[in-house]
Amino acid sequence: MNSKLMRAYFFDMDGVLFNSMPYHAIAWEEVMKDHDLPFTAYDCYLNEGRTGESVIREAMWKARNRDATPDEIKQIYTEKSERFNLLAQRAGGTVVIDGVAEVLCYVQSTGSQIWVVTGSGMRSLLDNLNNALPPVFQRDRMITAFDVTHGKPDPEPYLKAWERSG
């Protein structure tokens, strides 16, 4: 592959840059249980990449046949984020996927743009990118849950990154 043909590379965060999915799975399962919403670790993996809001709305529809209120969404997602941070902290921090630092340095050396396209809205993970990995990420080259109406698996996050990358 001729790297000069690649103007931008898009990286997901969970499961690509960081091995954070186990913490997400436990946090989602525990917090949903606290709110009497059936949700397993397996459900977390099935919903990987989606925004927290959409995950909560779907769980509420399945369990109670109604939409989640804005207050419920905020409360559940706040609790989930706090639980995730506690789990990651207890484990010594979020683990970087083996080899990803080398890949990022190589991509940077080609002059191509490096983008993060994630369904995450967790500021702790977003803030941790340049601390845990080579400092190749720029805030204006991140598409997160805060930037889209429809999270993954909808193509909107990647289409937005593609449009912004020129």
Regions found by a protein language model. Name each.
Residues 99-103, 157-160:
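Well-ordered alpha-helical segments embedded in enzymatic catalytic cores
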Residues 3-13, 17-98, 105-110, 123:
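N-terminal helical cap/lid subdomain that shapes the substrate entry/recognition surface
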Residues 93, 120-166:
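Substrate-recognition "cap/lid" segment bordering the active-site pocket of phosphatases
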